[in-house]
Amino acid sequence: MIKALCIALTLVCLAGCSKPGPVVLDKAGHGLQQKQRPLIVGKWYSDSPTTEGGHVMEIAEHRANGTYVVSFRVIDKTGKVKDSQEAGFWGTAGNIYFTITKGWIQGSKFIPAPPGLADLEDAYQILELKNGKFRYRSVENKNVYSAIKVDDTFQFPGIPPSKG
């Protein structure tokens, strides 16, 4: 009885020690990335309600070299406007779109972000990317964002910029 129990326990332990399968080193199979990257390059606009009763507008410019600048305009429920800008790197991996914020732009000055802050690295599942529409979901908080592609000269509509 003890011998049978020891054999069974050994088999269970060995089953958990199996080696992983081989990995593919060639990146040639990344066709999805090659199709999506050019679709994201350009300027995108979104306007979303906030849980506090206001809304946030965003103009994100994704460059072909993998850098981005995004301008935010937050309008609270009283109508107070606050503008900000951040810059960093963006990319795709499969159906994941990601950004890494490297700092903020204040006037014409770049303020670098402290290195290694997890809050400045964001990953999103791409839900839709076609016909000038980009919908994506935050992996972390599950918020869904929707943006439309706009002309390179596009600016925030109708509200004068806040005084910084």
What positions do the PLM features span?
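Sec-dependent N-terminal signal peptides
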Residues: 4-14
